Structures are given as structure tokens and as C-alpha cells.
Amino acid sequence: MMIYAYSELYLNDAQIFLAKAFDYALNDCQQSPDWFAPIFARSSICRQLEMGSPSIISGKAGEEAVKELLESIIPGEDFPSSSFHQGRSPAYWAGWALAYNQWYTRKRFKDIFMRVPLSEILSMYKLYHEMDLTNFVTDLDIRYNAIILETK
């Protein structure tokens, strides 16, 4: 039996949380994916998400969490309200798929983004957004394992 990062009962909420968080950060706030992803991955919000904390997954909107994170990093900046997007953007899909991947593999977002940048994950949208998520997980795992990090 596979042991996942947290109960499957929270998975859908976690996927929606991260999908909306990435959509807001990249589309509404116009943040660069490869600037935003490592900042997100080092945040307490991310650590709580990785553990399946209900206070984050079900208690806070992804957009709200990102706005708080960005305001703590760039004080005084006026970040926009989230806007309605027709359909699902590549950023939304990336958040959705990455939340599933993290739940399934138990890999930390920090480790994922050190090997596979968010911009590369966004480029996978066209191929994988209509496939079963396990195809994305398999490909991401191949890319992840292909990168050997130097250790000191």
C-alpha cells in the first residue's frame, strides 16, 4: 500500500489551492515562474501545504496566501485582486498537477523546483493537460531523476 503525503480527502482542495495560487501569482501579479516558484517553495505556506494542513488547504484561498507571501517580500507593493479567467491557464494546470505530484510522490516542492523549473513544467501543459495526471507524474519523475545535484 502506498503512503501518500496526506489523506486523499484533502487532495482536491490542495489541488485547487495551488492551482489558484499559481494562476494568481503568474497571471494576475505577472510574476516570473522561475522567480516565484523558489520563493513559494521556501515559504511556511508551502511547508504546511506539503503536510496537508487543513488550515492552509481548506482554510485559505490560494490567491490570498500568495498575496500575503508577496506582500511580505515586496512591502508597499499594491497587488491586484484576483481576476476571473475563462478556462484553465497553464499556470492553473501546473499548480493542479504539481499538488497531485507532491501528494503522490511526497517530494518537497523545493526539491522539485531545484531540478525542474516551473517554466519547464508550464511547457508541459500542451502535452499533458488533457491526459491522466499519472502521465505527468511519470514524466516529471524522469526529468527529476535525470538531474544530479552537486553536493558539498
Per-segment meaning from a language model:
Residues 11, 15-68:
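N-terminal interaction modules that seed assembly of large macromolecular complexes
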Residues 31-38, 77-82, 109-112:
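Short, surface-exposed acidic
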Residues 122-152:
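Glycine-rich, aromatic-bearing surface loops/beta-hairpins
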Residues 54-86, 90:
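Long, compositionally biased
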Residues 109-116, 143-145:
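Intrinsically disordered, low-complexity tails and linkers flanking structured cores
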Residues 19-24, 42, 71, 92-103:
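Short, hydrophobic/amphipathic alpha-helical patches that form generic packing surfaces
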Residues 4-5, 9-12, 88-106, 116-128:
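A structured, charge-rich N-terminal accessory region that forms the first stable segment of a protein
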